[in-house]
Design a protein with these regions (language model features):
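N-terminal Rossmann NAD(P)H-binding glycine-rich loop of SDR-like oxidoreductase domains
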Residues: 16-31
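Conserved glycine-rich Rossmann-like NAD(P)H-binding loop of the short-chain dehydrogenase/reductase
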Residues: 37-47
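Rossmann-fold NAD(P)-binding glycine/threonine-rich loop
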Residues: 114-135
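C-terminal catalytic/substrate-binding lobe primarily of soluble NAD(P)-dependent oxidoreductases
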Residues: 158-406
Length: 406
């Protein structure tokens, strides 16, 4: 896909990145420094030591501020005096609504990378409150959801009629810097019944059901993915009218981690059901997350080495930090059945997630998005302008298939 790379962004602004010292949040800060070098960036995080290390590394107009995501007054305080805030504190089923409510109370424009379907529903329900506060809030603007949604919109705008939109992703589980929120999200998406959109209505289906091999761009290529709980089927039908089917399927690599997740889900070990161990009560999912975080210390070195070798042989330089995305938009154009496919293979899942959030925030702060309220990305972002900017750092491959006249 060839995009004209001419989109001017105003860079003299003040931006707060909540969770800006974290795995994804630090990527957002880096993207802002690269794309808007004159902007003032505030890293709001509970871990000020790591925040200061990031400031020392990047320099520029970056400052730090302590924030407690469980304290609404603390959240409001750091968001009060900025042009826009970016939420990178997860998991979003815990923090999505809390942080968005604080942004509304602070009357500050807002973008986040909310990737949990239930949090997405709850945040969209705050639309009128955000509208009354006079702010623009865009939720779920990462890689998936986010870039997937914008690609779905872009493809849909090229069709006369849209019938089906299929989104998929494959993510590394080998990144040594991956935080607990990402693991908790994957477990959340992989358990119980999750929403999808079929025959023009929302229905519940089993997570990790209906395996399908999706052909991502090389070197990722064919990877088996499964139904997961994600925002795309929740939001896309709200904005792309007439679509009858919207799906999201995903997985992680190496394959052993996918198989382990299936077993955990079947045994109920990644649910939010609470249990007590040695007098301490907690959701069983918290234990599973800590277990996964401890794999490097618990698993024999030869097993870790074998998994790394397997992934490197299969995915090459994408093995450790990569991600793959695929979007298919099916419908009708000039009375012909047409399918547009978009594929992304990115060496860095952090970049692929952080860059869309940074660009979206810059667009809102620069006045490129006028609507007030809470929206998913496809609801308010101009797909062509956005993808022109994405193309500077992330390659998107487009294919078109046409059948005979109807």
């Amino acid at each position: 896909m060839q995009f004209e790379r001419t989109f001017s962004l105003v860079t003299k602004m003040r931006i707060c990145v909540l969770g800006g010292a974290g795995h994804i949040g630090s990527g957002v800060v880096r993207a802002l420094v690269k794309r808007a070098p004159d902007a003032e960036v505030v890293i709001a995080d509970k871990n000020l030591e790591e925040a200061e290390e990031l400031v020392a590394e990047l320099g520029g107009k970056i400052s730090t501020q302590s924030v407690d995501a469980n304290d609404s007054k603390s959240l409001i305080k750091v968001m009060k005096d900025v042009d826009i805030a970016i939420g990178a504190i997860g998991p979003y089923y815990t923090y999505g609504v809390k942080v968005l409510k604080a942004a509304i109370d602070a009357k500050t424009n807002f973008v986040d990378i909310d990737d949990d379907y239930d949090a997405t529903k709850a945040c969209l329900a705050l639309h009128e409150g955000a509208k009354k506060a006079g702010i623009t809030a865009i939720i779920g603007l990462g890689a998936t959801p986010g870039l997937t949604n914008i690609l779905a919109k872009y493809g849909s705008e090229k069709l006369d009629k849209v019938d089906e939109i299929h989104t998929a992703w494959a993510w590394t589980a080998m990144d040594p810097f991956m935080g607990p929120a990402i693991i908790a999200h994957y477990f959340h998406a992989s358990t119980g019944d999750v929403p999808t959109y079929r025959d023009g209505k929302w229905v519940e289906i089993s997570a990790l059901s209906e395996p399908e091999v999706v052909d991502f761009p090389p070197p990722l290529s064919g990877i088996e993915v499964y139904n997961v709980g994600h925002p795309e089927p929740v939001t896309i039908p709200r904005y792309i009218k007439g679509v009858k089917v919207v799906t999201n399927k995903g997985t992680v690599w190496p394959s052993l981690m996918t198989e382990a997740s299936k077993i955990f889900a079947k045994l109920g070990l990644i649910s939010l059901k609470e249990f007590t161990i040695k007098g301490v009560t907690m959701p069983v999912r918290d234990v599973a997350v800590q277990f996964v975080m401890s794999i490097p210390d618990l698993t024999p070195a030869e097993t870790i080495s074998a998994l790394a070798t397997e992934a490197e042989e299969r995915y090459g330089e994408y093995a450790l930090e990569g991600v793959g995305l695929k979007v298919k938009v099916k419908g009708e154009s000039q009375r012909k059945t047409t399918c547009y496919s978009y594929g992304v293979a990115c060496r860095s899942a952090v970049v692929c997630t952080a860059l869309p959030a940074a660009l979206g925030a810059l667009m809102v702060a620069a006045g490129k998005v006028k609507e007030k309220g809470v929206f998913a990305p496809e609801g308010v972002i101009d797909s062509k302008s956005f993808l022109k900017e994405i193309a500077k750092d992330i390659e998107v491959l487009e294919t078109e298939e046409k059948a005979g006249k109807l």
